[in-house]
Amino acid sequence: MSVNEKYELRGINHLALVCADMQRTIDFYSGVLGMPLIKTIELPNDMGQHFFFDCGNGDTIAFFWLVDAPDGVPGISAPAGLPGEEELNSATGSMNHVAFAVPPEKFDEYYAKFKEEGIKVSFVLNHDDSPMGVTRHPHDGTFVRSFYFQDPDGALLEFACWTKTFTEADVVHEPRTAADRKVPVAR
């Protein structure tokens, strides 16, 4: 296992997203996903609110409700929809999605539960090193299993479970640079 020799980082303290309706956000994250609301803050000068939810293992996901936040733009500020159905692109500097770790032994149960509750979910993706990067069925080369869904504001969320431990052999690709990008031209 790799160790950070420079800083003693202990994971993600929180991710902060922006919502349009804090009550709807509470209803989804606490009501649908079962995450306890653990801290609420009123921002100064009537700027808005900042609420935190416990998403397990001491990690939190937070939301700003800002009185003057612009509306999100699907495909720019976040992906337009679920993987396999819509474009997965989002703008440079944006958050593409949040993946919550779930126990591998409960993954299929959770997927079925989402479907039973009528939550729109992607098909299960079994991520691997094949040319397409995913398969419909798990196999020995699968390194993570996941499914995707969206919150009420369109943020792309994922339930994921690791299925193997990585080694140095898993780091094989040369990093791309800004020069490799194909930036769309505005009309």
Q: What is each PLM-predicted segment?
A:
Residues 18-71:
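Core segments of cupin and vicinal oxygen chelate
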Residues 155:
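Conserved Rossmann-like nucleotide-cofactor binding loop
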Residues 54-59, 74-83, 89:
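Active-site-adjacent scaffolding segments
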Residues 72-75, 164-178:
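A short, polar/charged loop-to-alpha-helix boundary motif
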Residues 43-44, 127-129, 163:
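Conserved beta-strand edge residues that scaffold enzyme active sites
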